[in-house]
């Protein structure tokens, strides 16, 4: 074969193939042996919970987790400080320049992802955990339907969009509790679409916004109690997470009010009363979850496991 055009095309193809394989390779290290005694992770998301509102909030369950766990109110968003791109970074361990989700409501990459996993989506924490343990039981329930396009739903055992509706989040809480009790998933998430709505409707830190926080805390308390009833509590790490904060009635820009949000870890193997004193970005979440389970992470991820939270 001596056709220069064909030869150049083949060279480009093989160069791309080698790059793709390298990007989707995994990284392992001695520290990634998992946290002893942990069988479950329960991740609870509060869309739009701003870091600067937590101290004044009536949230006894979350504050008890902070007092007995590791926490920061200054976990930084990626830019823009909007929802889909930040939740994508939570799941995918990188920023939008790599996963490609770059707008508030992105359901697919706004420009091509730098790498794709076996299910045709940038590798998520659900992808990684399924590869680590093909028999793992995972669950994702969410009030905002865009999550279903961000999680790699082919790698999730069960996922469902449950709108807030008139139940004001009682429906998703009850469904999540039922799944926990019946299936005892190793990794699961319940993502509330609040207090983001109150922020947009009345303003971040407004009276209506602050009134919503104890309601959400009560749902979190119900979930914690459910893990006790299911016999999961003693070997569960809880994660409380948000995607962004807000200012006035919006977010998406570059103020710290919009970019800083809480991240809390509570459970066995987690330091107690530890204020995380290292920089944390939204995309550090997925590598930390992988670290807890001892799973290898894709080489393409750029976040890091927050080693400082572990005892």
Question: Predicted regions span which residues?
Answer:
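Active-site His/acidic residue clusters
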Residues: 145-160, 174-218, 222
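Beta-strand elements within well-structured catalytic alpha/beta cores of enzymes
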Residues: 37-50, 65, 90, 129, ...
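Active-site nucleophile/metal-coordination loop of metallo-enzymes that catalyze phosphate/sulfate
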Residues: 34-38, 50-131
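Metal-dependent active-site segment of extracytoplasmic phospho-/sulfohydrolases and closely related
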Residues: 43, 61, 215-255, 289
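Second-shell loop/turn segments in exported
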Residues: 48-53, 76-77, 110-117, 127-128, ...
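Bacterial N-terminal signal peptides that target proteins for export
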Residues: 3-17
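Substrate-binding rim/cap in mid-to-C-terminal beta-strand-loop elements of soluble/periplasmic
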Residues: 91, 254-296, 307
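C-terminal motif of bacterial Sec signal peptides marking the signal peptidase cleavage site
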Residues: 27-28
């Amino acid at each position: 074969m001596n056709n220069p055009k064909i030869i150049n095309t083949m060279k480009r193809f093989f160069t791309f193939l080698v790059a793709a394989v390298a990007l989707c390779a995994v990284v392992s290290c001695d520290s990634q042996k998992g946290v002893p005694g942990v069988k479950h992770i329960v991740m609870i998301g509060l869309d739009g919970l701003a870091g600067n509102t937590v101290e004044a909030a009536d949230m006894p369950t979350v504050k008890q987790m902070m007092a007995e766990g590791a926490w920061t109110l200054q976990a930084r968003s990626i830019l823009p400080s909007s929802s889909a791109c930040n939740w994508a970074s939570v799941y995918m361990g990188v920023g939008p320049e790599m996963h490609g989700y770059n707008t508030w409501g992105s359901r697919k990459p706004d420009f091509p992802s730098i790498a794709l996993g076996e299910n045709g989506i940038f590798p998520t924490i659900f992808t990684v955990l399924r590869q680590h343990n093909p028999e793992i039981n995972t669950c994702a329930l969410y009030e905002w339907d865009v999550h279903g396009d961000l999680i790699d739903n082919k790698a999730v055992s069960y996922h469902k969009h449950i709108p807030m509706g008139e139940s004001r989040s009682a429906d998703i809480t009850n469904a999540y509790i039922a799944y926990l009790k019946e299936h005892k998933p190793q990794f699961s998430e319940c993502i509330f679409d609040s207090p983001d709505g109150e922020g947009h409707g009345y303003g971040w830190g407004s009276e209506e916004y602050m009134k919503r926080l104890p309601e959400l805390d009560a749902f979190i308390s119900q979930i914690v109690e459910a893990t006790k009833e299911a016999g999961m509590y003693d070997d569960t790490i809880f994660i409380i997470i948000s995607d962004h904060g807000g200012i006035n009635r919006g977010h998406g820009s570059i103020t710290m009010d919009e970019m800083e949000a809480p991240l809390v870890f509570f459970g066995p193997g987690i330091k107690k009363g530890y204020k995380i004193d290292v920089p944390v970005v939204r995309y550090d979440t997925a590598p930390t979850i992988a670290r807890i389970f001892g799973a290898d992470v894709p080489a393409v991820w750029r976040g890091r496991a927050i080693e400082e939270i572990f005892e």
